[in-house]
Amino acid sequence: MFGAEKGSTDKLDGRKFSIGIVQARFNESVTNALAEACKQELAALGVEEKNIKHVKVPGALEVPCALQAMAESDKYDALIALGCIIRGETYHFELVANESGSAVTRLALDYQLPIANAILTTENLAQAEARQIEKGRDAARVAVEMANLLDELA
């Protein structure tokens, strides 16, 4: 979007991976679209449906708690965080965006586990809807690419 260059990588292969997805329900029409695009892309990358665990939580602030439980289970090669935070009239937007983003990053580092963060932060619903499909796909690709990389580095 907006001329950003994502770069390219070798063909991604997710056949051997187990992926956990945590979806926030808040702004559910957007997060449902994120989840659907993400799961379709995971399938296209070879991740079997039986190797995808998808759970829902109330909102973006609850996503890290579920991610942590998944990380501690040691069942997943990568995790994906899905959510949508739309700016309102109060400081709550910044609080939720900053705290959820920071927690997701901390978990990835603490557990040495790839976590693709697709918690959208937008000014309005139209911006979220414009990003919901591509960002869902991106999250799947990031998870599989990073799982492959960490597997290679181990």
UniProtKB/Swiss-Prot annotation:
It catalyses: (2S)-2-hydroxy-3-oxobutyl phosphate + 5-amino-6-(D-ribitylamino)uracil = 6,7-dimethyl-8-(1-D-ribityl)lumazine + phosphate + 2 H2O + H(+). InterPro entries: LS, LS/RS, LS/RS_sf. GO terms for molecular function: 6,7-dimethyl-8-ribityllumazine synthase activity. GO terms for cellular component: cytosol; riboflavin synthase complex. Keywords: Riboflavin biosynthesis, Transferase. (2S)-2-hydroxy-3-oxobutyl phosphate binds at E89, T90, R131. NCBIfam families: lumazine-synth. This is 6,7-dimethyl-8-ribityllumazine synthase. It comes from Polaromonas sp. (strain JS666 / ATCC BAA-500).
